[in-house]
Amino acid sequence: MKINVINQQELREINSKKIKDIAKKVLLNEVGKGNFELNILITDDKSITEFNKYRGKSTPTDVLSFSYGLSEPVIGDIVISVESIEKQAPDFGNSFEEEFYYILIHGLLHIVGYDHENSEEDAKKMFEVQDQYFHQLIKDRRR
């Protein structure tokens, strides 16, 4: 398993080692060991808006996940906007760092097959798992 962190922004310092550690823990737990790569692009609102056009939207978002399948050499790409995270963190009572890792976990779960847009049941399951990882790996209380 190889996790590539590409930092294309200068707004915030990013801890690439911690990003990789969290990603590896979630992926090991969800899919086990594997010979695959995952790319995590850290960017700003302007850049993520360009990626979001793929979804037919012309606005920024906090995270986008592009899953290519767990049997592929590169299982996916995650794009995270530090600007969006910085704006929304106070709304959830999180520091920037806490919100960043919460959103990272969200993106990782999409890569391994979780979804929250198809049904309420799927959404409930995904957010429960996301909260569990957040509680276990980042913050000792639920969001």
Swiss-Prot record:
Subcellular location as annotated: Cytoplasm
List ligand-binding residues for Zn(2+). H106, H110, H116
Q: Entry's InterPro entries?
A: MetalPrtase_cat_dom_sf_prd, YbeY, YbeY_CS
How is the co-factor bound, per the entry?
Answer: Binds 1 zinc ion.
Disulfide bond residue pairs = none
Q: Which domain of life is it from?
A: Bacteria
GO CC terms: cytoplasm
The protein's Enzyme Commission number = 3.1.-.-
Q: Mind telling me which HAMAP family this protein's record contains?
A: Endoribonucl_YbeY
Entry-linked NCBIfam families:
rRNA maturation RNase YbeY
Q: What is this protein called?
A: Endoribonuclease YbeY
Please tell me the species this chain comes from. Answer: Petrotoga mobilis (strain DSM 10674 / SJ95)
